[in-house]
Protein backbone atom coordinates (compact mmCIF):
# COMPACT_ATOMS: atom_id res chain seq x y z
CA UNK A 1 0.00 0.00 0.00
CA UNK A 2 2.78 2.41 0.87
CA UNK A 3 4.56 1.96 -2.46
CA UNK A 4 1.32 2.49 -4.42
CA UNK A 5 0.61 5.69 -2.45
CA UNK A 6 4.05 7.16 -3.28
CA UNK A 7 3.62 6.24 -6.95
CA UNK A 8 0.28 8.04 -6.99
CA UNK A 9 1.92 11.20 -5.68
CA UNK A 10 4.60 11.08 -8.39
CA UNK A 11 2.16 10.91 -11.32
CA UNK A 12 0.97 14.58 -11.15
CA UNK A 13 4.59 15.71 -10.96
CA UNK A 14 5.50 13.69 -14.05
CA UNK A 15 2.49 15.04 -15.93
CA UNK A 16 3.42 18.62 -15.04
CA UNK A 17 7.00 18.07 -16.19
CA UNK A 18 5.77 16.67 -19.51
CA UNK A 19 3.42 19.62 -20.05
CA UNK A 20 6.20 22.08 -19.20
CA UNK A 21 8.53 20.35 -21.66
CA UNK A 22 5.96 20.58 -24.45
CA UNK A 23 5.43 24.29 -23.75
CA UNK A 24 9.19 24.96 -23.81
CA UNK A 25 9.57 23.11 -27.11
CA UNK A 26 6.70 25.15 -28.58
CA UNK A 27 8.26 28.43 -27.46
CA UNK A 28 11.62 27.37 -28.89
CA UNK A 29 10.10 26.49 -32.25
CA UNK A 30 7.95 29.62 -32.39
CA UNK A 31 10.65 32.17 -31.65
CA UNK A 32 13.66 30.30 -33.05
CA UNK A 33 16.73 29.62 -31.01
CA UNK A 34 19.06 31.82 -33.02
CA UNK A 35 16.71 34.81 -32.91
CA UNK A 36 16.18 34.51 -29.18
CA UNK A 37 19.88 34.87 -28.52
CA UNK A 38 19.89 38.22 -30.27
CA UNK A 39 16.92 39.69 -28.46
CA UNK A 40 16.14 41.02 -25.02
CA UNK A 41 12.39 40.79 -24.64
CA UNK A 42 10.45 43.38 -22.69
CA UNK A 43 13.06 46.15 -23.00
CA UNK A 44 11.78 49.70 -23.09
CA UNK A 45 12.28 52.17 -25.92
CA UNK A 46 12.87 55.88 -25.56
CA UNK A 47 11.47 57.90 -28.45
CA UNK A 48 12.93 61.22 -29.47
CA UNK A 49 13.49 63.49 -32.41
CA UNK A 50 14.81 66.86 -33.34
CA UNK A 51 11.96 68.52 -31.45
CA UNK A 52 11.71 66.03 -28.59
CA UNK A 53 13.53 65.60 -25.31
CA UNK A 54 15.95 62.80 -26.18
CA UNK A 55 15.91 61.55 -22.61
CA UNK A 56 12.12 61.20 -22.47
CA UNK A 57 11.12 57.59 -21.77
CA UNK A 58 8.33 55.80 -23.60
CA UNK A 59 6.17 53.03 -22.15
CA UNK A 60 6.15 51.00 -25.36
CA UNK A 61 7.30 47.46 -24.64
CA UNK A 62 9.54 45.80 -27.17
CA UNK A 63 7.98 42.38 -26.63
CA UNK A 64 6.20 41.00 -29.69
CA UNK A 65 2.48 40.43 -29.89
CA UNK A 66 -0.20 40.43 -32.56
CA UNK A 67 -2.54 43.32 -33.25
CA UNK A 68 -4.50 41.92 -36.18
CA UNK A 69 -4.25 39.60 -39.14
CA UNK A 70 -3.37 40.77 -42.67
CA UNK A 71 -3.86 38.15 -45.35
CA UNK A 72 -2.05 35.03 -44.17
CA UNK A 73 0.36 36.88 -41.89
CA UNK A 74 0.37 38.93 -38.72
CA UNK A 75 0.82 42.60 -38.08
CA UNK A 76 2.80 43.21 -34.89
CA UNK A 77 2.09 46.02 -32.50
CA UNK A 78 5.80 46.07 -31.70
CA UNK A 79 9.01 44.30 -32.64
CA UNK A 80 11.59 43.08 -30.16
CA UNK A 81 14.83 45.01 -29.95
CA UNK A 82 18.07 43.26 -30.88
CA UNK A 83 20.72 43.02 -28.21
CA UNK A 84 23.08 46.03 -28.11
CA UNK A 85 25.96 43.92 -29.45
CA UNK A 86 24.03 43.70 -32.73
CA UNK A 87 23.89 47.48 -33.19
CA UNK A 88 26.17 47.10 -36.25
CA UNK A 89 24.65 43.90 -37.63
CA UNK A 90 25.04 43.24 -41.37
CA UNK A 91 22.99 40.04 -41.82
CA UNK A 92 24.71 38.76 -44.98
CA UNK A 93 28.21 39.67 -43.75
CA UNK A 94 27.89 38.27 -40.24
CA UNK A 95 30.93 36.25 -39.17
CA UNK A 96 29.00 34.84 -36.21
CA UNK A 97 26.56 33.32 -38.70
CA UNK A 98 29.45 31.75 -40.63
CA UNK A 99 30.68 30.18 -37.39
CA UNK A 100 27.23 28.98 -36.29
CA UNK A 101 26.43 27.43 -39.67
CA UNK A 102 29.90 25.85 -39.85
CA UNK A 103 30.41 27.04 -43.40
CA UNK A 104 33.54 25.61 -45.01
CA UNK A 105 35.15 28.64 -46.61
CA UNK A 106 38.56 29.19 -48.14
CA UNK A 107 40.06 32.06 -46.17
CA UNK A 108 42.88 32.49 -48.68
CA UNK A 109 40.26 33.36 -51.31
CA UNK A 110 38.51 35.86 -48.99
CA UNK A 111 35.30 33.82 -49.05
CA UNK A 112 34.65 34.73 -45.41
CA UNK A 113 34.27 38.38 -46.49
CA UNK A 114 31.75 37.55 -49.22
CA UNK A 115 27.97 37.47 -48.78
CA UNK A 116 26.49 34.54 -46.85
CA UNK A 117 22.87 35.30 -45.99
CA UNK A 118 20.95 33.65 -43.15
CA UNK A 119 18.09 31.28 -43.98
CA UNK A 120 14.64 32.56 -42.93
CA UNK A 121 14.71 30.68 -39.62
CA UNK A 122 17.97 32.41 -38.62
CA UNK A 123 16.96 35.98 -39.39
CA UNK A 124 16.98 38.49 -36.57
CA UNK A 125 13.46 39.85 -36.89
CA UNK A 126 14.14 42.62 -34.44
CA UNK A 127 14.93 46.33 -34.48
CA UNK A 128 18.62 47.23 -34.58
CA UNK A 129 19.33 49.65 -31.71
CA UNK A 130 21.57 52.68 -32.19
CA UNK A 131 24.70 52.76 -30.02
CA UNK A 132 24.40 54.44 -26.61
CA UNK A 133 24.32 58.22 -26.91
CA UNK A 134 23.74 58.19 -30.68
CA UNK A 135 23.53 61.66 -32.27
CA UNK A 136 22.03 62.84 -35.54
CA UNK A 137 25.03 62.82 -37.95
CA UNK A 138 26.93 65.99 -38.77
CA UNK A 139 25.68 67.52 -42.02
CA UNK A 140 27.48 67.58 -45.35
CA UNK A 141 29.92 69.10 -46.27
CA UNK A 142 31.29 69.33 -42.71
CA UNK A 143 30.82 65.58 -42.36
CA UNK A 144 33.56 64.93 -44.91
CA UNK A 145 36.06 66.06 -42.30
CA UNK A 146 34.43 65.08 -38.98
CA UNK A 147 31.87 62.70 -37.46
CA UNK A 148 30.54 62.03 -33.96
CA UNK A 149 32.69 59.43 -32.20
CA UNK A 150 29.67 58.07 -30.33
CA UNK A 151 27.98 57.06 -33.60
CA UNK A 152 30.90 54.81 -34.59
CA UNK A 153 32.75 54.12 -31.34
CA UNK A 154 35.80 52.53 -33.00
CA UNK A 155 39.14 54.28 -32.68
CA UNK A 156 41.40 51.36 -33.63
CA UNK A 157 42.22 52.85 -37.04
CA UNK A 158 43.18 56.19 -35.49
CA UNK A 159 45.94 54.43 -33.54
CA UNK A 160 46.97 51.88 -36.17
CA UNK A 161 47.20 54.48 -38.96
CA UNK A 162 48.34 57.41 -36.82
CA UNK A 163 51.40 57.96 -39.02
CA UNK A 164 49.28 58.08 -42.19
CA UNK A 165 46.67 60.70 -41.21
CA UNK A 166 43.64 58.49 -41.86
CA UNK A 167 41.74 59.79 -38.83
CA UNK A 168 42.34 61.55 -35.53
CA UNK A 169 40.25 61.42 -32.35
CA UNK A 170 39.54 64.90 -30.97
CA UNK A 171 37.19 64.99 -28.00
CA UNK A 172 33.68 63.95 -29.01
CA UNK A 173 34.56 63.86 -32.70
CA UNK A 174 36.70 61.90 -35.11
CA UNK A 175 38.49 64.09 -37.65
CA UNK A 176 39.67 63.05 -41.12
CA UNK A 177 42.71 65.06 -42.29
CA UNK A 178 42.50 63.49 -45.75
CA UNK A 179 45.54 61.24 -45.50
CA UNK A 180 46.02 57.69 -46.71
CA UNK A 181 48.60 54.92 -46.82
CA UNK A 182 50.30 56.41 -49.88
CA UNK A 183 49.17 60.01 -49.52
CA UNK A 184 50.11 61.06 -45.99
CA UNK A 185 50.05 64.74 -46.98
CA UNK A 186 46.51 64.75 -48.28
CA UNK A 187 44.30 63.15 -50.91
CA UNK A 188 43.91 66.47 -52.76
CA UNK A 189 47.65 66.70 -53.51
CA UNK A 190 47.76 63.03 -54.50
CA UNK A 191 44.80 63.48 -56.89
CA UNK A 192 46.39 66.54 -58.51
CA UNK A 193 49.62 64.57 -58.92
CA UNK A 194 47.80 61.78 -60.76
CA UNK A 195 46.17 64.31 -63.10
CA UNK A 196 49.57 65.84 -63.74
CA UNK A 197 51.02 62.42 -64.57
CA UNK A 198 48.32 61.99 -67.23
CA UNK A 199 48.82 65.55 -68.57
CA UNK A 200 45.20 66.50 -67.89
CA UNK A 201 44.36 70.24 -68.12
CA UNK A 202 44.82 72.25 -64.92
CA UNK A 203 45.76 69.08 -63.03
CA UNK A 204 42.08 68.17 -62.71
CA UNK A 205 41.53 64.42 -62.83
CA UNK A 206 38.11 64.53 -64.51
CA UNK A 207 39.83 65.61 -67.76
CA UNK A 208 37.07 67.95 -68.84
CA UNK A 209 34.30 65.59 -67.72
CA UNK A 210 35.62 62.59 -69.66
CA UNK A 211 36.42 60.76 -66.42
CA UNK A 212 33.41 60.53 -64.14
CA UNK A 213 33.01 57.10 -62.41
CA UNK A 214 35.88 55.63 -60.35
CA UNK A 215 36.33 52.44 -58.32
CA UNK A 216 38.59 52.62 -55.25
CA UNK A 217 39.56 49.09 -54.15
CA UNK A 218 40.59 48.76 -50.51
CA UNK A 219 39.52 52.34 -49.93
CA UNK A 220 40.26 52.77 -46.22
CA UNK A 221 37.98 55.51 -44.86
CA UNK A 222 37.34 56.76 -48.44
CA UNK A 223 39.22 60.06 -48.32
CA UNK A 224 40.32 59.50 -51.94
CA UNK A 225 36.67 59.32 -53.06
CA UNK A 226 35.65 62.12 -50.73
CA UNK A 227 38.14 64.59 -52.21
CA UNK A 228 37.31 63.56 -55.79
CA UNK A 229 33.76 64.87 -55.34
CA UNK A 230 35.08 68.42 -55.69
CA UNK A 231 36.10 67.48 -59.26
CA UNK A 232 32.61 66.08 -59.97
CA UNK A 233 33.96 62.53 -59.94
CA UNK A 234 31.81 59.80 -58.37
CA UNK A 235 33.83 57.05 -56.70
CA UNK A 236 32.55 53.69 -55.55
CA UNK A 237 34.71 53.20 -52.46
CA UNK A 238 34.97 49.46 -51.85
CA UNK A 239 36.34 47.56 -48.86
CA UNK A 240 35.46 44.41 -46.90
CA UNK A 241 34.18 44.16 -43.35
CA UNK A 242 37.64 43.14 -42.16
CA UNK A 243 40.13 43.74 -39.36
CA UNK A 244 40.31 47.44 -40.20
CA UNK A 245 37.10 47.92 -38.24
CA UNK A 246 34.26 49.78 -39.88
CA UNK A 247 36.10 51.69 -42.61
CA UNK A 248 33.03 51.65 -44.89
CA UNK A 249 30.83 52.72 -41.98
CA UNK A 250 33.10 55.73 -41.47
CA UNK A 251 32.89 56.51 -45.20
CA UNK A 252 29.09 56.50 -45.23
CA UNK A 253 28.88 58.44 -41.96
CA UNK A 254 31.02 61.07 -43.71
CA UNK A 255 28.53 61.23 -46.61
CA UNK A 256 30.87 59.57 -49.13
CA UNK A 257 29.59 56.87 -51.54
CA UNK A 258 30.79 53.45 -50.38
CA UNK A 259 29.93 49.76 -50.51
CA UNK A 260 30.95 46.69 -48.51
CA UNK A 261 32.57 44.22 -50.86
CA UNK A 262 35.69 42.25 -51.63
CA UNK A 263 37.63 40.88 -54.57
CA UNK A 264 37.27 37.21 -53.69
CA UNK A 265 35.54 34.57 -55.81
CA UNK A 266 32.35 36.35 -56.92
CA UNK A 267 32.04 39.14 -59.44
CA UNK A 268 31.61 42.63 -58.08
CA UNK A 269 27.93 43.72 -58.34
CA UNK A 270 28.68 46.12 -61.20
CA UNK A 271 28.20 45.57 -64.95
CA UNK A 272 31.01 45.53 -67.49
CA UNK A 273 32.47 48.84 -68.67
CA UNK A 274 31.27 50.84 -65.65
CA UNK A 275 34.35 52.78 -64.50
CA UNK A 276 36.82 55.12 -66.16
CA UNK A 277 39.45 54.53 -63.48
CA UNK A 278 40.16 51.90 -60.83
CA UNK A 279 42.47 52.75 -57.95
CA UNK A 280 44.47 50.69 -55.48
CA UNK A 281 46.66 52.45 -52.93
CA UNK A 282 48.56 49.72 -51.10
CA UNK A 283 45.38 47.66 -50.99
CA UNK A 284 47.31 44.48 -50.11
CA UNK A 285 45.75 42.41 -52.90
CA UNK A 286 47.70 39.61 -54.54
CA UNK A 287 46.97 40.48 -58.16
CA UNK A 288 48.93 37.51 -59.49
CA UNK A 289 46.91 34.79 -57.78
CA UNK A 290 44.75 32.34 -59.75
CA UNK A 291 46.06 33.36 -63.16
CA UNK A 292 45.39 37.04 -62.49
CA UNK A 293 41.65 36.56 -61.94
CA UNK A 294 41.30 39.62 -59.68
CA UNK A 295 43.05 41.90 -62.16
CA UNK A 296 40.80 40.45 -64.88
CA UNK A 297 37.77 41.36 -62.77
CA UNK A 298 38.98 44.97 -62.74
CA UNK A 299 39.49 44.68 -66.49
CA UNK A 300 35.85 43.59 -66.86
CA UNK A 301 34.45 46.67 -65.08
CA UNK A 302 36.82 49.20 -66.71
CA UNK A 303 35.68 51.07 -69.81
CA UNK A 304 37.62 51.05 -73.10
CA UNK A 305 40.66 53.24 -72.53
CA UNK A 306 40.09 53.07 -68.77
CA UNK A 307 42.92 53.43 -66.25
CA UNK A 308 44.22 51.41 -63.31
CA UNK A 309 46.19 53.60 -60.88
CA UNK A 310 48.38 51.43 -58.67
CA UNK A 311 50.31 52.92 -55.74
CA UNK A 312 52.30 50.19 -54.03
CA UNK A 313 55.88 49.19 -53.18
CA UNK A 314 55.89 46.88 -56.19
CA UNK A 315 55.75 49.97 -58.41
CA UNK A 316 58.94 51.53 -57.00
CA UNK A 317 60.75 49.38 -54.41
CA UNK A 318 64.04 47.73 -55.35
CA UNK A 319 64.15 44.69 -53.07
CA UNK A 320 64.16 41.27 -54.72
CA UNK A 321 60.57 40.27 -53.88
CA UNK A 322 59.01 43.55 -55.03
CA UNK A 323 61.03 43.43 -58.25
CA UNK A 324 59.80 39.89 -58.91
CA UNK A 325 56.17 40.91 -58.40
CA UNK A 326 56.65 43.94 -60.64
CA UNK A 327 58.10 41.81 -63.44
CA UNK A 328 55.27 39.28 -63.24
CA UNK A 329 52.55 41.95 -63.04
CA UNK A 330 54.06 43.80 -65.99
CA UNK A 331 54.07 40.60 -68.03
CA UNK A 332 50.46 39.82 -67.06
CA UNK A 333 49.04 43.25 -67.91
CA UNK A 334 51.04 43.21 -71.13
CA UNK A 335 49.27 40.01 -72.18
CA UNK A 336 46.00 41.74 -71.21
CA UNK A 337 46.90 44.49 -73.71
CA UNK A 338 47.35 47.16 -71.03
CA UNK A 339 50.04 49.78 -71.52
CA UNK A 340 51.77 52.15 -69.11
CA UNK A 341 50.17 55.59 -69.41
CA UNK A 342 52.41 57.10 -66.72
CA UNK A 343 54.83 56.06 -63.97
CA UNK A 344 56.25 58.34 -61.32
CA UNK A 345 57.66 57.72 -57.86
CA UNK A 346 55.33 55.29 -56.08
CA UNK A 347 52.54 55.17 -58.67
CA UNK A 348 52.05 53.50 -62.02
CA UNK A 349 48.96 54.10 -64.17
CA UNK A 350 48.08 51.47 -66.74
CA UNK A 351 45.55 51.97 -69.53
CA UNK A 352 43.23 49.52 -71.27
CA UNK A 353 43.06 49.45 -75.08
CA UNK A 354 40.31 51.35 -76.89
CA UNK A 355 39.48 48.54 -79.32
CA UNK A 356 39.64 44.76 -79.70
CA UNK A 357 42.59 44.98 -82.12
CA UNK A 358 45.24 43.98 -79.58
CA UNK A 359 43.13 41.11 -78.23
CA UNK A 360 42.59 39.68 -81.69
CA UNK A 361 46.25 40.11 -82.59
CA UNK A 362 47.63 37.99 -79.73
CA UNK A 363 49.41 34.71 -80.43
CA UNK A 364 47.20 31.58 -80.18
CA UNK A 365 47.27 30.10 -76.68
CA UNK A 366 48.19 33.38 -74.99
CA UNK A 367 47.05 33.52 -71.37
CA UNK A 368 44.74 34.81 -70.06
CA UNK A 369 42.31 33.69 -72.78
CA UNK A 370 39.42 35.67 -74.22
CA UNK A 371 36.06 34.91 -72.59
CA UNK A 372 33.66 32.64 -74.45
CA UNK A 373 31.18 34.43 -76.67
CA UNK A 374 28.26 33.06 -74.60
CA UNK A 375 29.69 34.46 -71.34
CA UNK A 376 27.58 37.43 -70.20
CA UNK A 377 29.93 40.06 -68.70
CA UNK A 378 26.96 41.85 -67.12
CA UNK A 379 25.67 38.84 -65.14
CA UNK A 380 27.02 39.59 -61.68
CA UNK A 381 24.75 38.65 -58.75
CA UNK A 382 26.30 35.60 -57.11
CA UNK A 383 28.22 34.81 -60.31
CA UNK A 384 31.77 33.47 -60.07
CA UNK A 385 34.64 35.48 -61.52
CA UNK A 386 36.25 34.21 -64.71
CA UNK A 387 39.95 34.29 -65.52
CA UNK A 388 39.44 35.62 -69.03
CA UNK A 389 39.40 38.89 -70.97
CA UNK A 390 36.05 40.42 -71.88
CA UNK A 391 36.06 41.76 -75.43
CA UNK A 392 34.27 44.97 -76.33
CA UNK A 393 30.95 45.12 -78.11
CA UNK A 394 30.90 45.86 -81.83
CA UNK A 395 29.70 49.39 -80.98
CA UNK A 396 32.59 50.10 -78.61
CA UNK A 397 35.11 48.56 -81.00
CA UNK A 398 33.93 50.67 -83.94
CA UNK A 399 33.66 53.91 -81.97
CA UNK A 400 37.04 53.30 -80.27
CA UNK A 401 35.59 53.81 -76.82
CA UNK A 402 32.29 53.95 -74.99
CA UNK A 403 30.91 56.84 -77.03
CA UNK A 404 29.79 58.64 -73.88
CA UNK A 405 29.36 62.41 -73.66
CA UNK A 406 31.47 64.27 -71.07
CA UNK A 407 29.88 65.04 -67.71
CA UNK A 408 27.41 66.70 -67.11
CA UNK A 409 25.92 66.26 -70.59
CA UNK A 410 26.32 62.52 -70.03
CA UNK A 411 23.52 62.58 -67.43
CA UNK A 412 20.78 63.41 -69.93
CA UNK A 413 22.29 62.04 -73.15
CA UNK A 414 20.76 58.72 -74.30
CA UNK A 415 23.31 56.00 -73.39
CA UNK A 416 24.57 53.91 -76.32
CA UNK A 417 23.63 50.72 -74.44
CA UNK A 418 19.91 51.61 -74.58
CA UNK A 419 19.81 49.40 -77.66
CA UNK A 420 20.68 46.37 -75.51
CA UNK A 421 17.17 46.62 -74.02
CA UNK A 422 15.33 47.69 -77.15
CA UNK A 423 14.72 51.11 -75.58
CA UNK A 424 14.41 54.11 -77.87
CA UNK A 425 15.68 57.62 -77.27
CA UNK A 426 12.06 58.70 -76.89
CA UNK A 427 11.49 56.19 -74.06
CA UNK A 428 14.63 57.42 -72.30
CA UNK A 429 13.67 61.08 -72.57
CA UNK A 430 10.11 60.45 -71.37
CA UNK A 431 11.44 58.49 -68.39
CA UNK A 432 13.80 61.33 -67.52
CA UNK A 433 10.99 63.90 -67.66
CA UNK A 434 8.54 61.69 -65.73
CA UNK A 435 10.93 61.32 -62.82
CA UNK A 436 11.82 65.01 -62.88
CA UNK A 437 8.16 65.79 -62.25
CA UNK A 438 7.86 63.08 -59.60
CA UNK A 439 10.93 64.31 -57.71
CA UNK A 440 9.53 67.85 -57.76
CA UNK A 441 6.38 66.45 -56.13
CA UNK A 442 8.40 64.53 -53.54
CA UNK A 443 10.36 67.64 -52.55
CA UNK A 444 7.20 69.72 -52.29
CA UNK A 445 5.85 67.13 -49.85
CA UNK A 446 9.13 66.88 -47.93
CA UNK A 447 9.96 70.58 -47.77
CA UNK A 448 8.04 71.30 -44.53
CA UNK A 449 10.14 68.63 -42.79
CA UNK A 450 13.65 69.14 -44.17
CA UNK A 451 16.34 71.77 -44.59
CA UNK A 452 18.71 72.03 -47.55
CA UNK A 453 21.30 69.88 -45.73
CA UNK A 454 18.97 67.34 -44.08
CA UNK A 455 19.49 64.67 -46.71
CA UNK A 456 22.85 63.46 -48.05
CA UNK A 457 22.94 59.66 -48.55
CA UNK A 458 20.03 58.45 -50.70
CA UNK A 459 19.14 54.99 -51.96
CA UNK A 460 16.82 54.30 -54.89
CA UNK A 461 15.72 50.72 -54.22
CA UNK A 462 14.46 50.12 -57.77
CA UNK A 463 16.39 52.50 -59.96
CA UNK A 464 15.37 51.43 -63.49
CA UNK A 465 17.33 53.82 -65.77
CA UNK A 466 18.47 56.12 -62.95
CA UNK A 467 16.14 59.00 -63.75
CA UNK A 468 15.18 59.50 -60.09
CA UNK A 469 18.84 60.14 -59.28
CA UNK A 470 19.29 62.28 -62.40
CA UNK A 471 16.49 64.56 -61.21
CA UNK A 472 18.46 65.25 -58.01
CA UNK A 473 21.54 66.60 -59.77
CA UNK A 474 21.20 70.14 -58.41
CA UNK A 475 20.90 68.94 -54.81
CA UNK A 476 23.92 68.23 -52.62
CA UNK A 477 23.20 64.51 -52.41
CA UNK A 478 24.43 61.24 -53.87
CA UNK A 479 22.30 58.22 -54.78
CA UNK A 480 23.01 54.50 -54.48
CA UNK A 481 20.99 53.18 -57.43
CA UNK A 482 19.95 49.60 -56.75
CA UNK A 483 18.80 47.44 -59.65
CA UNK A 484 16.95 44.24 -58.59
CA UNK A 485 18.73 41.15 -59.87
CA UNK A 486 15.55 39.52 -61.19
CA UNK A 487 14.66 42.34 -63.61
CA UNK A 488 16.29 44.03 -66.61
CA UNK A 489 19.94 44.71 -65.78
CA UNK A 490 19.68 48.44 -66.45
CA UNK A 491 22.55 49.24 -64.09
CA UNK A 492 24.86 49.67 -67.09
CA UNK A 493 22.61 52.51 -68.30
CA UNK A 494 22.94 54.12 -64.87
CA UNK A 495 26.74 53.98 -65.01
CA UNK A 496 26.66 55.27 -68.58
CA UNK A 497 24.80 58.33 -67.24
CA UNK A 498 27.64 59.04 -64.79
CA UNK A 499 25.74 57.66 -61.80
CA UNK A 500 26.47 54.59 -59.71
CA UNK A 501 24.83 51.70 -57.93
CA UNK A 502 24.76 47.94 -57.41
CA UNK A 503 22.75 44.87 -58.38
CA UNK A 504 20.86 43.35 -55.44
CA UNK A 505 18.02 41.03 -54.41
CA UNK A 506 15.65 42.60 -51.90
CA UNK A 507 14.78 39.14 -50.60
CA UNK A 508 18.14 39.52 -48.82
CA UNK A 509 19.85 42.19 -46.72
CA UNK A 510 21.89 44.90 -48.45
CA UNK A 511 25.66 45.06 -47.96
CA UNK A 512 25.81 48.11 -45.73
CA UNK A 513 25.97 48.97 -42.05
CA UNK A 514 22.90 50.00 -40.06
CA UNK A 515 21.96 53.70 -40.07
CA UNK A 516 23.77 54.66 -43.29
CA UNK A 517 21.10 56.31 -45.49
CA UNK A 518 19.07 59.49 -44.95
CA UNK A 519 16.38 58.70 -47.50
CA UNK A 520 15.10 55.53 -49.19
CA UNK A 521 13.00 55.60 -52.36
CA UNK A 522 10.81 52.49 -52.63
CA UNK A 523 8.97 52.48 -55.96
CA UNK A 524 6.88 49.30 -56.34
CA UNK A 525 9.62 47.31 -54.63
CA UNK A 526 7.34 45.98 -51.87
CA UNK A 527 4.83 44.77 -54.47
CA UNK A 528 7.65 43.17 -56.43
CA UNK A 529 9.11 41.14 -53.59
CA UNK A 530 5.65 39.95 -52.52
CA UNK A 531 5.16 38.61 -56.05
CA UNK A 532 8.42 36.70 -55.64
CA UNK A 533 7.11 35.10 -52.47
CA UNK A 534 9.48 36.99 -50.20
CA UNK A 535 8.43 38.64 -46.95
CA UNK A 536 7.28 42.26 -46.98
CA UNK A 537 7.85 42.33 -43.23
CA UNK A 538 11.48 41.29 -43.64
CA UNK A 539 11.95 44.04 -46.21
CA UNK A 540 10.47 46.68 -43.91
CA UNK A 541 12.81 45.59 -41.12
CA UNK A 542 15.74 45.78 -43.54
CA UNK A 543 14.71 49.28 -44.60
CA UNK A 544 14.57 50.26 -40.94
CA UNK A 545 18.05 48.79 -40.39
CA UNK A 546 19.77 50.84 -43.08
CA UNK A 547 17.82 54.07 -42.48
CA UNK A 548 19.24 56.68 -40.14
CA UNK A 549 17.14 57.84 -37.19
CA UNK A 550 15.05 60.84 -38.33
CA UNK A 551 15.52 59.65 -41.93
CA UNK A 552 12.74 59.41 -44.52
CA UNK A 553 11.24 56.76 -46.79
CA UNK A 554 9.38 57.65 -49.98
CA UNK A 555 7.03 54.76 -50.73
CA UNK A 556 5.34 54.80 -54.12
CA UNK A 557 3.17 51.73 -54.54
CA UNK A 558 -0.36 50.39 -54.78
CA UNK A 559 -2.97 51.43 -52.23
CA UNK A 560 -3.05 47.92 -50.74
CA UNK A 561 0.71 48.04 -50.12
CA UNK A 562 0.52 51.49 -48.57
CA UNK A 563 -2.27 50.25 -46.29
CA UNK A 564 -0.08 47.33 -45.25
CA UNK A 565 2.87 49.60 -44.46
CA UNK A 566 0.65 51.84 -42.35
CA UNK A 567 -0.18 48.86 -40.14
CA UNK A 568 3.53 48.53 -39.34
CA UNK A 569 4.22 52.18 -38.53
CA UNK A 570 3.81 51.86 -34.78
CA UNK A 571 5.81 48.63 -34.55
CA UNK A 572 8.70 50.15 -36.50
CA UNK A 573 8.52 53.53 -34.74
CA UNK A 574 7.88 55.28 -38.04
CA UNK A 575 5.63 58.29 -38.45
CA UNK A 576 3.49 59.01 -41.52
CA UNK A 577 4.45 62.48 -42.76
CA UNK A 578 2.34 62.74 -45.91
CA UNK A 579 0.08 60.65 -48.14
CA UNK A 580 -0.82 61.63 -51.67
CA UNK A 581 -2.43 59.94 -54.66
CA UNK A 582 -0.37 60.01 -57.85
CA UNK A 583 -1.42 62.50 -60.51
CA UNK A 584 -3.97 61.24 -63.04
CA UNK A 585 -1.55 62.19 -65.80
CA UNK A 586 1.11 59.92 -64.30
CA UNK A 587 1.61 56.59 -66.04
CA UNK A 588 1.33 54.93 -62.61
CA UNK A 589 -1.83 56.80 -61.67
CA UNK A 590 -2.97 53.92 -59.43
CA UNK A 591 0.06 54.51 -57.17
CA UNK A 592 -0.12 56.20 -53.79
CA UNK A 593 2.77 58.15 -52.28
CA UNK A 594 3.44 57.59 -48.58
CA UNK A 595 6.24 59.51 -46.87
CA UNK A 596 7.32 58.21 -43.48
CA UNK A 597 9.97 59.34 -41.02
CA UNK A 598 11.91 57.07 -38.69
CA UNK A 599 11.84 58.26 -35.10
CA UNK A 600 14.98 58.49 -33.02
CA UNK A 601 14.64 56.00 -30.20
CA UNK A 602 17.12 54.78 -27.63
CA UNK A 603 17.12 51.69 -25.44
CA UNK A 604 16.72 52.04 -21.70
CA UNK A 605 20.43 51.23 -21.32
CA UNK A 606 21.32 54.15 -23.60
CA UNK A 607 19.04 56.47 -21.66
CA UNK A 608 20.71 55.48 -18.40
CA UNK A 609 24.10 56.28 -19.96
CA UNK A 610 22.84 59.79 -20.73
CA UNK A 611 21.69 60.44 -17.17
From Swiss-Prot:
Tell where it localizes.
Golgi apparatus membrane
Q: Please state the Enzyme Commission number of this protein.
A: 2.1.1.-
Per the UniProt entry, the glycosylated residues are 345
Its record classes its membrane topology as: Single-pass type II membrane protein
Q: Report the enzyme's class at the first EC level.
A: transferase
Segments in the Cytoplasmic topological domain: 1-11
Gene3D superfamilies named in the record: Vaccinia Virus protein VP39
Q: Which Pfam families match?
A: Methyltransf_29 (PF03141)
PANTHER family xrefs: METHYLTRANSFERASE PMT1-RELATED, SAM-DEPENDENT METHYLTRANSFERASE
- Family stated for the protein in its record: Belongs to the methyltransferase superfamily.
UniProt protein name: Probable methyltransferase PMT1
Q: What is the organism field in this record?
A: Arabidopsis thaliana (Mouse-ear cress)
